[in-house]
Amino acid sequence: MAARMGSKVAAILAILSVLVVHGSCKGHPVNYNVSDASAYGSGWLPARATWYGAPTGAGPDDNGGACGFKNVNQYPFSSMTSCGNEPIFKDGKGCGSCYQIRCNKDPSCSGNIETVIITDMNYYPVARYHFDLSGTAFGAMAKPGLNDKLRHSGIIDIQFRRVPCNYPGLKINFHVEEGSNPVYFAVLVEYEDLDGDVVQVDLMESKSAYGGATGVWTPMRESWGSIWRLDSNHRLQAPFSLRIRSDSGKTLVANNVIPANWSPNSNYRSIVQFS
């Protein structure tokens, strides 16, 4: 308990010292460059890293986060998660994107490359690029046996680069959110290979309100993070097909992935994946 409190105090003091330098959360503007942070092949970029939550946890107490993902302490996220500031989180459009990170300036750093997934947001003006990592991900950058010592550093310099996501053996999953009903449909999209993030989702009903085939894609709206919704003026006719577009413009269609007897708070695994 004392060690855990000590690590939190160190992290808080480190962040406060940075905020003093920058003035405050409303102080001097940070020079963001979204394109550099989200581009592949940009090489290693400098960033600062902090951590939050339990020392060996996934970050949020509920194992979720602003992106809407659930159980990020379990496979395939496996607690290797991070908040991103604006160039990384991108108002939710960066949810699910994958980054390699490493540190070598702190004596406890191993220099080994680790991969994290963006599942949450943190807009404190700590640096141009800021990763607020889970305790697990932060400690993973340490030399063997020095995980806690590195976490006690509170805030460290790291390097990062965007990389394609890879979920071996998994297809894209759609989780129908609690509260969905015949005229309101909300879905979480997860486990996308390559870009990992989604910038648009469209829904096609199996038939129109008048009984005929539609063949019409209706754009859904981003609720927050990786959750997309459709507010309808009529009872939606399932099964539904879903079309998703990734950050790089690739499109996939999951035909009839949401069955006629769908229910809220349920997972529906597709048979499609980006490649």
UniProtKB/Swiss-Prot annotation:
Q: Do you know which Gene3D superfamilies this protein is assigned to?
A: Expansin, cellulose-binding-like domain (2.60.40.760), RlpA-like domain (2.40.40.10)
Sorted UniProt keywords:
Cell wall, Cell wall biogenesis/degradation, Disulfide bond, Glycoprotein, Membrane, Secreted, Signal
Glycosylation-annotated residues: N33
Q: Which residues form the signal peptide?
A: 1-25
Q: What SUPFAM superfamilies does its record include?
A: Barwin-like endoglucanases, PHL pollen allergen
Per the entry, induction is: By gibberellin (GA3) and wounding.
| SMART domains tied to this protein | DPBB_1
Q: How does it sit in the membrane?
A: Peripheral membrane protein
Q: Can you give the residue ranges of the Expansin-like EG45 domain?
A: 64-170
Listed GO biological process terms = plant-type cell wall loosening; sexual reproduction
The subcellular location is: Secreted, Cell wall; Membrane
Report the function annotation for this chain. May cause loosening and extension of plant cell walls by disrupting non-covalent bonding between cellulose microfibrils and matrix glucans. No enzymatic activity has been found. May be required for rapid internodal elongation in deepwater rice during submergence.
What is the official name of this protein in its record?
Expansin-B6
Native species: Oryza sativa subsp. japonica
Q: What is the lineage of its organism?
A: Eukaryota, Viridiplantae, Streptophyta, Embryophyta, Tracheophyta
